């Protein structure tokens, strides 16, 4: 990227106005919820809040694979978070994921609820929790093949 020679980055970045179309506000440079909204809670220990985007689908696939492998304690409830409507900025969702991004997982299977967010972190968390070979590192995969 080329900047003018006299360009000096500001000491404090300020968001002056929205630009970028419909989804510009989904990556806003401020934190916290914009409105109060309770999230639904189902009957299973795992509550997945997501949408059918590539990152959102990854966790659903992981849960389904765990169930197919016989991990019946991997039952989960999946709830739609419509990022087009800004539902990721609701108070309960932000309490689970302060980054206001999908997917977000609430694990109620232990004594205390655990919140896990970011698709990669959720996948690793589930792989470790269920001692699953689905996400072995290359060293672990090599060991598994021996």
Q: What positions do the PLM features span?
A:
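Single conserved hydrophobic/aromatic residue that forms the stacking wall/gate
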Residues: 136-146
């Amino acid at each position: 990227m080329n900047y003018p020679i006299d360009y000096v980055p500001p000491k404090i970045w300020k968001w002056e106005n929205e630009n970028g179309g419909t989804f510009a506000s989904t990556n806003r440079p401020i934190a916290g919820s914009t409105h109060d909204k309770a999230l639904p809670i189902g009957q299973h220990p795992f509550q997945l809040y997501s949408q059918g985007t590539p990152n959102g689908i990854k966790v659903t696939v992981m849960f389904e694979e765990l169930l197919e492998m016989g991990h019946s304690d991997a039952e989960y409830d999946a709830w739609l978070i419509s990022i087009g409507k800004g539902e990721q900025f609701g108070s309960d969702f932000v309490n689970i994921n302060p980054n206001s991004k999908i997917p977000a997982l609430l694990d109620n299977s232990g004594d205390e609820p655990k919140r896990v967010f970011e698709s990669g972190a959720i996948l690793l968390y589930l792989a470790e929790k269920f001692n699953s070979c689905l996400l072995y590192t290359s060293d672990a995969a090599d060991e598994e093949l021996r």
